[in-house]
Amino acid sequence: MADKVLKEKRKLFIHSMGEGTINGLLDELLQTRVLNQEEMEKVKRENATVMDKTRALIDSVIPKGAQACQICITYICEEDSYLAETLGLSAALQAVQDNPAMPTCSSPEGRIKLCFLEDAQRIWKQKLQRCHVQNTIIKWSERYTSGSFEMQWLFLRTNFIERFWRNILLLPLHKGSLYPRIPGLGKELQTGTHKLS
């Protein structure tokens, strides 16, 4: 919702922003980690006029989503009430706060936790790996019941054996339920003596 408000008010926002407000907003967005230091310096360094800085700032905040835009709107409403009134942000802020359809987050405090791009990419990769591994386990357990040599070879050659399979498959191996046809594999995984060839 807040991102839609900023998109609608973009042109008026660019023409109305003052030097002090843009600098304060940049500091606020850095402090709340909407922008990182590099992004803030880029906005300041590469744009000579206040309008250019405002344009660059708004164009970097809007793609970051509703929570980032909400922080921007809240700062303007609290620090520059005249600008907020000019842009019609006071009413928009109230509408956003009253809207129960605002997206919630997964943080324990009930707020969205903003992070750096590198952290977001790392988390995304971890989730993708988890999904891939879970799908692989299911496929392998289904295919291995046929006892094919190809499956045994694939299982032994996988990079996951050293780190992942030792932890995930140890319990089923102890029970002898999933992979009974690979002699000694449970012991090798347990002691870490299995070597990839």
UniProtKB/Swiss-Prot annotation:
A GO CC term attached to the entry: protease inhibitor complex
Pfam family, one: CARD
Signal sequence coordinates: none
Domain of life: Eukaryota
Keyword list, A-Z: Protease inhibitor, Thiol protease inhibitor
Entries under SMART domains matching the protein: CARD
Keyword Methyltransferase: no
GO BP annotations listed: cellular response to lipopolysaccharide; negative regulation of interleukin-1 beta production; negative regulation of lipopolysaccharide-mediated signaling pathway; negative regulation of protein binding; negative regulation of tumor necrosis factor-mediated signaling pathway; positive regulation of canonical NF-kappaB signal transduction; positive regulation of NF-kappaB transcription factor activity; proteolysis
Domain CARD: 1-91
Expression sites (tissue/organ): Widely expressed. Expressed at higher level in placenta, spleen, lymph node and bone marrow. Weakly or not expressed in thymus.
GO MF, any single term: caspase binding
Induction: Down-regulated in patients suffering of Huntington disease.
Protein role: Caspase inhibitor. Acts as a regulator of procaspase-1/CASP1 activation implicated in the regulation of the proteolytic maturation of pro-interleukin-1 beta (IL1B) and its release during inflammation. Inhibits the release of IL1B in response to LPS in monocytes. Also induces NF-kappa-B activation during the pro-inflammatory cytokine response. Also able to inhibit CASP1-mediated neuronal cell death, TNF-alpha, hypoxia-, UV-, and staurosporine-mediated cell death but not ER stress-mediated cell death.
Subunit structure: Homooligomer. Interacts with CASP1, CASP4, CARD8 and RIPK2.
Name of protein: Caspase recruitment domain-containing protein 16
Name of the gene encoding the protein in the UniProt record: CARD16
